Swiss-Prot record:
It is found in: Secreted. Its main location: secreted. Keywords: Disulfide bond, Protease inhibitor, Secreted, Serine protease inhibitor. It comes from Hirudo nipponia (Korean blood-sucking leech). Belongs to the protease inhibitor I15 (antistasin) family. This is Piguamerin. Inhibits plasma and tissue kallikrein, and trypsin. May be involved in leech hematophagia. Disulfide bonds join 3-14, 8-19, 21-41, 26-45, 30-47. GO terms for molecular function: serine-type endopeptidase inhibitor activity. GO terms for cellular component: extracellular region.
Length: 48
């Protein structure tokens, strides 16, 4: 997603021209935690 000249990852949304982490809740259990992007944002319901 184009966001103020930057491209947000799938784990981010554009808010006020900035890429921010998606805040979501998932009831899925991941023994190694959830997958994160290069910015430290968690991918929704995606195990690492």
């Amino acid at each position: 997603t184009d966001c103020g000249g930057k491209t947000c990852s799938e784990a981010q949304v554009c808010k006020d021209g900035k890429c921010v982490c998606v805040i979501g809740q998932c009831r899925k259990y991941c023994p190694n935690g959830f997958k994160k992007d290069e910015n430290g944002c968690t991918f929704p319901c995606t195990c690492a």
